[in-house]
């Protein structure tokens, strides 16, 4: 298990956030392992630490799966050489937030709680949506029905990576295979074009698992019903 602590920035990035995200290069289809239970524990530990350190206005959230090595022209194939789950934990998204000592304490505090719960949640491969999609974060934070989106493939990178046809199916399979124990369901976004939804449906059919719209993740009761459909 490997965590890297970092800072987050971006033109449209939200402020006062503690984020955690799985590692992978979605366009090329290379992914590090992602343990859904430990990923969920880390997200929830960040959420709890916000309250503990009285970080008013802060939010704990996930981000889309990505790898900062692409910014430096590194080969994404090297991700296959790491056999253990990897995650980035980040404070965002401005110098004011990066230098907040209480935020740094919250991250440090959260790290020691990553192994507190050995529950394996139901596992979703999340396809489509935007980089910060609240439905993906909130389903991991709710207590009613333990679920985690172990890899999150946003729409823009599925498009740039041509996640259609045989090539797209192979990349989706690579994302699913990078999750120890496999996946229990696939979610897709309403705004995805038909060819991208089709390849998600194809993988769900091959794995004999449910597939549903991402909005289902917002309601634990509907999520349970969707996850348990046969």
Locations of regions flagged by a protein language model:
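Acidic, Ser/Thr-rich low-complexity intrinsically disordered segments
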Residues: 121-191
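Intrinsically disordered, low-complexity linker/loop segments enriched in Gly/Pro
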Residues: 17-75
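Short acidic, S/G/P-rich loop/turn micro-motifs used as interaction or catalytic elements
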Residues: 9-10, 96, 191-196
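Generic non-transmembrane alpha-helical segments
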Residues: 38-53, 106-117, 203
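C-terminal accessory extensions appended to soluble enzyme cores
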Residues: 180, 195-230
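Active-site-adjacent mobile loop/cap segments within catalytic or ligand-binding domains
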Residues: 61-118
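A short, glycine/acidic-enriched catalytic loop
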Residues: 10-34, 143-162
């Amino acid at each position: 298990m490997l965590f890297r602590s970092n800072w987050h920035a971006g033109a449209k990035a939200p402020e006062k956030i503690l984020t955690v995200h799985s590692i992978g290069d979605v366009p090329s289809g290379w992914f590090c392992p992602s343990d859904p239970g430990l990923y969920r524990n880390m997200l929830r530990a960040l959420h709890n630490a916000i309250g503990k350190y009285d970080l008013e206005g802060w939010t704990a959230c996930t981000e889309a799966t990505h790898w900062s090595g692409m910014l430096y022209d590194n080969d994404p194939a090297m991700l296959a050489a790491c056999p253990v789950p990897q995650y980035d934990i980040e404070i965002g998204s401005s110098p004011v937030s990066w230098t907040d000592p209480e935020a740094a304490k919250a991250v440090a505090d959260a790290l020691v709680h990553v192994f507190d719960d050995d529950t394996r949640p139901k596992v979703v491969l999340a396809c489509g949506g935007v980089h910060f999609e609240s439905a993906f974060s909130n389903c991991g934070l709710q207590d009613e029905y333990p679920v985690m989106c172990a890899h999150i493939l946003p729409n823009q990178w599925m498009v740039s990576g041509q996640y259609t046809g045989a090539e797209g199916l192979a990349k989706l399979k690579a994302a699913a295979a990078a999750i120890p124990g496999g996946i229990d369901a696939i979610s897709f976004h309403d705004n995805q074009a038909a060819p991208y939804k089709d390849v998600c449906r194809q993988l769900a059919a091959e794995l004999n698992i449910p597939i549903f719209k991402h909005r289902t993740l917002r309601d634990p009761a509907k999520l349970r019903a969707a996850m348990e459909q046969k």
